[in-house]
Structure formats: C-alpha cells, structure tokens
Amino acid sequence: MSYFEHIPAIRYEGPQSDNPLAYHHYDPDKRVLGKTLAEHLRIAVCYWHTFVWPGHDIFGQAAFRRPWQQPGDALERARMKADAAFEFFTKLGTPFYTFHDTDVAPEGDSLREYAANFARMVDYLGERQQASGVRLLWGTANLFSHPRFAAGAATNPNPDVFAWAATQVCHALDATHRLGGENYVLWGGREGYETLLNTDLKRERDQFARFLSMVVEHKHRIGFKGALLIEPKPQEPTKHQYDYDVATVHGFLVQYGLQNEIRVNIEANHATLAGHSFHHEIANAFALGVFGSVDANRGDPQNGWDTDQFPNSVEELTLAFYEILRHGGFTTGGMNFDAKVRRQSIDPEDLFYGHVGAIDVLALALERAAVLVENDRLDALRRQRYAQWDDAFGRKILAGGYTLESLAADALARGVDPQHASGAQERLENIVNQAIYGLR
C-alpha cells in the first residue's frame, strides 16, 4: 500500500523551477568545501512530529486523519506507520531518520509487553532500513509522556519509576545499536521541578547523574560506538529543567565526571526559550568541547513556548553553519528536523512542503556559511582582535609566568596605559550580509 501515491519523488530542479514539490536549492550532489551538500547536512526526518502527532493541541482534539492513526490492532498500525515513514523518507531523498521508542511501537499494558512490542518493531525497522538504504541518525526513549513520569524519570521520587525508565533506555539504546544508529539522545523533559517546595535539588541531580552513568556503562558494555547526547531545554513541560542550556549541561557533566562521555544535541527553539540565539548555543558547545548534533526548527518570537516550526531563516542558519563548518563539520551528528506542520495543514502534501522548504533553506544557509569560511574575513578580524595574546607578554600570562602580585608590579613598573580598540561590530555584520545576499 502506498500512502503518498500521488506525490512524486522530490528532485532538484533549480531556482527557476516553480514546482512546489521540488528542491530549488538543495542539490545533494553539489560539492561545497570538498564535500557534497548531502554529506555536510546529514538530514534526518523525525518520527514523532511527522507520523505520530495527530494534530491536537491543549485547546483542541486531533485534527489529522492519517491512515496509520485510525483504530485497529496496535502492532499492525505501527507497521503501517513504518511503511508510511519509509515511503516518505525515500520520496524526500533524506538519508536519516530519528525516533523515540514509543513512536515506533505500542507501549502496551506492562513493561514486558512494551519490550516485546518494541523488539518486534525493531526487527521491522531493520527490514525497512535494509530495503530503502535510509539510516538511523539517533534513537531515544520517551520518558515524559506517560503519567508515571509526571514527576520525572531519573529524578522521580519513586525508584520504581527510575527502574522503569532504565528499562526503556536499555532497550532503546540496544535497538539504536542494532539498527546502526550513530547517536543516542537523552532529553530530560520531566527532569526538573514544578515547585521547590517539594523538591530536593541535590538528591535529584545525584539521581540524574547516576542514571547517566549507567547509560554510559551500558554503551561501552554493548560496544555502541555512537555518541551519547543530552538535549538542553530550559523549561516546558516542567517549570525548570536541569539541562537548561549548553553551559548548564556542561557544568553538570563536569561536576559528575561525565564530560568526556556525553555531548549535546542542540535544538534551535530550545536555545531561544533559554534566552539565547541558536548561534550562541552552537558556538558555546564547540567552545566547551561538547558539540554533537542539531535539531533544526524555529520558534515564534511572539509565543513563549516550543512551537517546533520548520526553519525558514537563511540569516539565522548561516551563522549556525558558519560555526559548524569552521570547526570541521558534523561527525556523528546531523540536521534533524524536530519540526511539525501546523494544525491546519491537514493534507499529505503539507508534510512534503514543510520539509522541502526547510531543506532548501539549509542548503542556502550552508552555502552562504561556506563563503564566510572561504573568504576568512570574519576569522581574520577575530585573530587580529586577540593578536596581543599571541605575543610574548600574553603567552607568559597564560603560561603561568606571573603571579597576581608580580603581574601587578610589572604593570606598575611599565606604566601600562591600555588603549581601547574598536570591536568593529558593524563591519562584521556587513561582511555577513554580503555573504548571505551575494553582494560579495
């Protein structure tokens, strides 16, 4: 059975085409900085927003009528969903996908039933991967939707909930390994608090760290070579989450000795919810040595929640890609579309329109970022700004050649009189705009 029979395979037709079901800027075979666009972008489609979400919101019921979401045998519907998903991936021409365990398999009425259902669907996903050539970018476990996780998973006051969550992660990590996944993501949607009045912060942080340590141990025990990634988010659904932003996650990892084992998966909309730019979070992840992968989406600046819209800003993404390219690009990570069509977008074509447009935006942004990397104008000005630290005096300070007292004595003896230099922000912004809009 075909679920998108009337929709052709999406091909590159160039910027002059007016076909809404074609790529206008994404030519997967085009080479930029020595790699193809497909190799740079490593695009993934997410299971949950694309095939699981029924179009409900907090004010209204499900608006979609997907064939695989209709009542019936749960495992049969899961197989239908997988068939639809892989037909979609294949027609879109995207190389990767991502999932939560309960996206792909019915949870059932017990932990044993969950494990059995998931095992059957992992077998089926393996068959679909082999037939299509589509690969798994990352897997994860849903530890936030069921009411048992209302007070958290790893941070729950009930150790039985901790054990249930550990079971899900054990199975999800095993499945990710078996399916050739390149990363495993841990998102602590309920790992936080609603009120401090009933919360023991130290205990919950210790529990969370113990849980992560167990995941790390299991990764090495089964021989999984992919990266473990935490996805930062400041709040929603909880009032405050312990993985607030990149810097918070890094500090947590260092505190518990996990900084060499876990990196971050950065979502654009989560960055803005934390009061940061997407550019900031990516740059900070590289500065702290924890960059892993990206969830590509956007929020609505007039809304204070996670709207998970498709990315449409070449300007925003150019700066994100600039950081990624200047640091060597993705290794195990990629660009996962953690994005969903709007509730009123009920037609099957809308799923394609959202992804096609966003993929074109990624391609445009990456090519503009490549211009910034190739012309080296931003980096040259940055190097010039810090050049004095590369002189003998600056190197001596950083190498521990002075104490605080001896440095003060030296400064007094030399009568240092620092002169302020321009930060040249306006010039730098002009350089970025020239690259984005093809002015130079």
From Swiss-Prot:
Listed SUPFAM superfamilies: Xylose isomerase-like
Chain sites annotated for binding Mg(2+) 2: E267, H270, D306, D308
Principal location listed in the UniProt entry: cytoplasm
Cofactor detail note: Binds 2 magnesium ions per subunit.
Keywords: Carbohydrate metabolism, Cytoplasm, Isomerase, Magnesium, Metal-binding, Xylose metabolism
Family stated for the protein in its record: Belongs to the xylose isomerase family.
PANTHER family, A to Z: PTHR48408, XYLOSE ISOMERASE (PTHR48408:SF1)
Protein name: Xylose isomerase
Provenance organism: Burkholderia cenocepacia (strain ATCC BAA-245 / DSM 16553 / LMG 16656 / NCTC 13227 / J2315 / CF5610)
Gene (name only): xylA
